């Protein structure tokens, strides 16, 4: 029985009779009379009409890609993460009553000023153990009323930044952190309670705990552990810090936002304790028109720097040591929400956001109150401190792996001068820490993660002479490899030598 004939019979079973002439017109064939509803099914063998293969492309070049497990140094860092410290930080931040950006900056016990003073002291404690390699600074500015309806009088907005200088590649910087300001139902209520336990004391607690631990280690690249302010008023602190870095031509190689990483339960009580979401933007917000057109023509919309950073984080942080799986979400952020990674993306940097797997909106941006017997508000009692600690392990794996690998290769390209079955790649070494070699990774275009890897050595070009792994059928990436097997995120090769449609 022909495929068209069989398909039309299948349609006849599930569609209204009046639709059949339309299908028949498209198929250019005649449709046999409809069988009765009691007739035996005709599609018993349908699943076998298109047998899938265990692997496609049919031949693999290189080897199957395996996730990167932590070495002894990273295992030691993970083992030092203290659930008690994370809980104590969250409880302390919630105890300030409100940390609204417009709240008191002078009251020693209540308001954002008291929280900032306490956080600065705690970051400084970490720095004191670093033998001078970590410094604590304030990134401050005055925000005036104007086009922002959530700023109703001039206010000092201060982000606390603890920067750990890299031992071998100090000019390359990775930024991580959460926001320490909070809010309730009214975005300009700066006097009512807003404990902000999950949103976002949970993220700040991770940043502070990792600063404490990392200060006694020597990552090769620099890491900034931050606590942002002004997030609830429009990502203001992160925007100012990102622009400060940009104005100083800082090499920010990645920004990892930690915003709401403390609760695994949804509003209906569903628990998802071993997954964490990672939101990864698609086409870069600052990409020029030529690059954007080329990206679309080669099907690279899903291989932005942010998404390849996300794939890298999945590889290094989803394992038995973290007890978590990183779940990539191909979006900038959740619907109608924003986060402090966005200003970094808008400044031309690569940024992603960690978020817990479920959300309870009765606990977010809510007044602390009881309505119809139900407790509302972002309270400490909602926290799952074990989950928050596992999230910290994920972030520790991320930051250590990134900071100890070489930077991504530069100017990665794929030669399309001629039409053939082979692929030729070229790239340039990254600035800073020299790689020990490079790898070409690839996957089928519909796969979310890299599946195969080719080790090419310490070269800056490679000819792939296998006709079975064709550039039309897979997505390629090139990544740097350093000492200890630490790898950079992969970079999508853009075509060169083409005359049309690329």
UniProtKB/Swiss-Prot annotation:
Superkingdom assignment: Eukaryota
Major place of residence: secreted
Entry binding sites for Zn(2+) 1: 179, 199, 259
Binding-site positions, Zn(2+) 2: 199, 232
Keyword Repeat part of the UniProt annotation: no
Cofactor info, note text: Binds 2 Zn(2+) ions per subunit.
Segments forming a coiled coil: none
EC number per UniProt: 3.4.-.-
EC class name: hydrolase
Keyword terms, alphabetized: Glycoprotein, Hydrolase, Metal-binding, Metalloprotease, Protease, Secreted, Signal, Zinc
Single biological process term from Gene Ontology: proteolysis
GO-annotated cellular components: extracellular region
Pfam families: Peptidase_M28
Signal peptide: 1-17
Database matches in InterPro entries: FN3_dom (IPR003961), FN3_sf (IPR036116), M28_fam (IPR045175), Peptidase_M28 (IPR007484)
Compartments reported by the entry: Secreted
UniProt cofactor(s): Zn(2+)
Similarity field: Belongs to the peptidase M28 family. M28B subfamily.
Family annotation (PANTHER family): METALLOPEPTIDASE M28 FAMILY MEMBER, PEPTIDASE M28 DOMAIN-CONTAINING PROTEIN
Name of the protein in its database record: Probable zinc metalloprotease Lema_P049800
Organism of derivation: Leptosphaeria maculans (strain JN3 / isolate v23.1.3 / race Av1-4-5-6-7-8)
